[in-house]
């Protein structure tokens, strides 16, 4: 069932195409199938064996399967594309899609360098295309409510954020998978999971100004690391302490500490198969309050927000400045794990 409904106002679904039909691409395709705001027309998949499997998949019987991104962009009916591709490819694919008149939804991270992110965003602005980003954690109902309360001053001055997004799912991947490659996914715990927490920290505190980070491979054979610690510093003195590991069972936690109280969100299961969130709230002079928030289709909510922006119903809720701030932080983190020093983060302009 779709998280929003557009049948009453007869808004046509956005004709969309998917680039990459791996682990996450399959999840995206299943989410699209539940939406009346999106219609999947085509998929690009370069792996011949995968394309053969797709040809006999009844789920894809009305979907065109191609091997060429260029041919895909020439499909006239296609309004938008979703990129589930290796990170190094994102910038050029965004630029090419925007030049072809397509709106673009890119899985995280948007790009691996600040200059590439600037180039990609500028192309979308120039061609008046909507750019979406796969930071679905922003769409969790508890995160939305928390940000509103922070904005209203309920928690006072925000002092610090503590967050953890760890998993061991990558042990199931072939050893030559691009997600385990130092070239295609440098600082693996960051590009896999930690970048979501960087985004949430920016959503709460704004762009960060400096970072120190440490990366190691301690519990796996992953060449791009499995254990990452990050300390982001923000203007005014607030910090975000972020932990991301790829060699331990799933943990998802986001906590914001303020001068009047604090708020913690814990995932019960991995976002791939969500089971809701345990919430803890502690206000100054009061007893702790715990509650449960039922699971919500956040991936779908993000995709439908993208579709609504394309149709002019609303602005896409992640700004270009926030996207740039995220990639600026990512690039500085990657520098810090090499230099072992505090690195300055580029201002998102």
What is each model feature region?
Residues 1-60:
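N-terminal Rossmann-like dinucleotide-binding module
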Residues 1-10, 80-82, 305-349:
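C-terminal helix-rich "cap/oligomerization" subdomain common to oxidoreductases
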Residues 27, 290-304:
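Active-site loop of classical SDR/Rossmann-like NAD(P)-dependent oxidoreductases
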Residues 62-69:
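Conserved SAM-binding strand-loop segment of SAM-dependent methyltransferases
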Residues 67, 106, 131-133, 162, ...:
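Hydrophobic residues in well-ordered beta-strands that form the structural core
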Residues 80, 86-138, 153:
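Beta-strand-loop-alpha-helix segment that lines the small-molecule cofactor/substrate pocket
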Residues 137-214, 218-221, 340:
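Predominantly a Rossmann-like dinucleotide-binding segment in NAD(P)-dependent oxidoreductases
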Residues 192, 198-272, 300-314, 348-349:
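Contiguous beta-strand/loop segments that form the cofactor/metal-binding neighborhood of enzyme cores
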